[in-house]
UniProtKB/Swiss-Prot annotation:
Known role: Major capsid protein that self-associates to form hexamers, building most of the capsid in association with pentons made of the capsid vertex protein and one dodecamer of the portal protein. The major capsid protein self-associates to form 160 hexamers, building most of the T=13 laevo capsid. Folding of major capsid protein requires the assistance of two chaperones, the host chaperone groL acting with the phage encoded gp23-specific chaperone, gp31. The capsid also contains two nonessential outer capsid proteins, Hoc and Soc, which decorate the capsid surface.
Protein name, as recorded: Major capsid protein
Cysteine pairs bridged by disulfides in the record: none
Similarity field: Belongs to the Tevenvirinae major capsid protein family.
Domain of life: Viruses
Post-translational modification: A proteolytic cleavage by the prohead core protein protease gives rise to the mature major capsid protein during virus maturation.
CC terms in the record's Gene Ontology section: T=13 icosahedral viral capsid; viral capsid
Subunit-structure text: Homohexamer. Interacts with the portal protein. Interacts with the capsid vertex protein that forms pentamers. Interacts with hoc; one hoc molecule associates with each capsid hexamer. Interacts with soc; this interaction reinforces the capsid structure. A total of 960 subunits of the major capsid protein forms the 160 hexamers.
Record keywords, A-Z: Capsid protein, Late protein, T=13 icosahedral capsid protein, Virion
The organism of origin for this protein: Enterobacteria phage T4
Residues with site note (Cleavage): 65-66
Pfam short name (any one): Gp23
Length: 521
């Protein structure tokens, strides 16, 4: 099998991608959708169900823009133009028409990375740099981590001397250097400028972090990083009879993750009498109507799955560095004066929400090292709030929600907030919330991946007992996660192992998304 280049795929499928009268496909998506077309074509060239006479007849009365009657070959220009050459005897073109209309409407193209698969399984590889020569050793930590700073003593003084870690009740000595691991920013080295005793009540990580920050603010502990003296460096690794002084080493590992295709399938049965009466009274074709129902339902379910996975894996927002002291974690409450910063009227409180969104977006950049959050998924009420206030540095006026399109009967894309965030409406949200997420300029730069394999497979048969017709559709695709999505883990062995999201590797851990519930609107 010859593997086509991106340019070859775009050239082959250009008539279908840009067909007159068909929904427009953005240039950035055309290469991906061309690959999906290629996978679909490969499937119906080899699968016998596409050549079933009854299925061909069922498809013969609808999707005329994508039929090529009697054409067993494949001509993308004819598909786009709706040209036929006789009775429909092969339904591949008609199925392609359904794919052409449905696939671009998936929200996954806007908020996920889209990676079409060539086979039922796909692989994602990640290279990780590690402190130490053994990348799988217990306690080994990953280097170049976007969230945690470098171990600034690893190649310097830390290679020759091990510094004690600060803990509750530790009494410091002036001039001595100590080490501490901050939960949010990683390892630091601190020199004592005065003698202090660490609070005995700092018994957990959060309390110890707060106590050490307090001592740093008071000037009792000062962050330091330093190289080793030349006299020590030249003796390392057993030089001139010295012992117990090895050079520090680094290594790397390549992790493999597997993504497997899943399936969705639906069927519908109807009576011959229903089909006859529907045709006679309403001029409608039962096959055409049911095909549209099944294909649309599958698309809507995939859309919902993508949104659910994002919210499922999103970190709890308004926590850590985005939490305003004194307010509730994970919730932005318009009735809480701390959250709205003492706002005098609604417009000011709405602007406080904008600032919280900015904080979450910046936190995504800090944890992922890829970029600030650039899209928002939110409930209707939250989108109305965003549409009712200006985003400029101005008086906090509140007005009618004219900034966005909040009518989900037309589109779930509401608009662009402040020139920074693409806003999408979760029309089925059970309570008010917003999720800030990041998707980069290429399809690998995302928190989760939608990986279509075979976009649509039609099936048709009859019940062996009553001979009534039955039709169905299948779709196969995978959902994958970015191997670097769990930013809080620095030990390579504890990073994501499976390529598919689960409660163990995803629930509340994906740094590419942050979700905040909203109350009191």
């Amino acid at each position: 099998m010859t593997i086509k280049t991106k340019a070859e795929l775009l050239n082959k499928w250009k008539p279908l991608l840009e067909g007159e009268g068909l929904p427009e496909i953005a240039n950035s998506k055309q290469a991906i959708i061309a690959k999906i077309f290629e996978n679909q074509e490969k499937d119906f060239q080899t699968a016998p169900e596409y050549k079933d006479e009854k299925i061909a007849q069922a498809f013969g009365s609808f999707l005329t823009e994508a039929e090529i009657g009697g054409d067993h070959g494949y001509n993308a220009t004819n598909i786009a133009a709706g040209q036929t050459s006789g009775a429909v005897t092969q339904i591949g073109p008609a199925v392609m028409g359904m794919v052409r209309r449905a696939i671009p409407n998936l929200i996954a193209f806007d908020i996920c990375g889209v990676q079409p698969m060539n086979s039922p399984t796909g692989q994602v590889f990640a290279l990780r740099a590690v402190y130490g020569k053994d990348p799988v050793a217990a306690g080994a930590k990953e280097a170049f981590h976007p969230m945690y700073g470098p171990d600034a003593m690893f190649s310097g003084q830390g290679a020759a001397k091990k510094f004690p870690a600060l803990a509750a009740s530790t009494q410091t000595t002036v001039g001595d250097i100590y080490t501490h691991f901050f939960q949010e920013t990683g390892t630091v080295y601190l020199q004592a400028s005065v003698q202090v005793t660490i609070d005995a009540g700092a018994t957990d990580a959060a309390k110890l972090d707060a106590e050490i920050k307090k001592q740093m603010e008071a000037g009792a502990l000062v962050e330091i990083a330093e190289g080793m003296a030349t006299s020590i460096a030249e003796l390392q690794e057993g030089f001139n009879g010295s012992t117990d002084n090895p050079w520090n080493e680094m290594g790397f590992r390549i992790d493999k993750q597997v993504i497997e295709a899943k399936s969705r399938q639906l069927k519908a049965a109807y009576s011959i009498e229903l089909a006859q009466d529907l045709r006679a009274v309403h001029g409608m074709d039962a096959d055409a109507e049911l095909s549209g129902i099944l294909a649309t339902e599958i698309m809507l379910e995939i859309n919902r799955e993508v949104v659910d996975w994002i919210n499922y894996s999103a970190q709890v927002g308004k926590s850590g560095m985005t939490l305003t002291p004194g307010s509730k974690a994970g919730v932005f409450d318009f009735q809480d004066p701390i959250d709205i910063r003492g706002a005098r009227w609604a417009g000011e409180s709405f602007k406080a929400l904008l600032f919280q969104i900015d904080k979450e977006a910046v936190e995504i950049a800090r944890q992922t090292g890829r970029g600030e959050g650039n899209f928002i998924i939110a409930s209707r009420n939250v989108v109305n709030v965003l549409a009712s206030v200006d985003t400029g540095i101005s008086y906090a006026a509140q007005g009618l929600a004219t900034g966005f399109s909040t009518d989900t009967t037309k589109s779930v894309f509401a608009g662009v907030l402040g020139g920074k965030y693409r806003v999408y409406i979760d029309q089925y949200a059970k309570q008010d919330y917003f999720t800030v997420g990041y998707k980069g300029p290429n399809e690998m730069d995302a928190g989760i991946y939608y990986a279509p394999y075979v976009a649509l497979t039609p099936l048709r048969g009859s019940d062996p007992k009553n001979f009534q017709p039955v039709m169905g559709f299948k779709t196969r695709y995978g959902i994958g996660i970015n191997p670097f999505a769990e930013s809080a883990a620095q030990a390579p062995a504890s990073r994501i192992q499976s390529g598919m999201p689960s409660i163990l590797n995803s629930l509340g851990k994906n740094a590419y998304f942050r979700r905040v519930y909203v109350k009191g609107i």
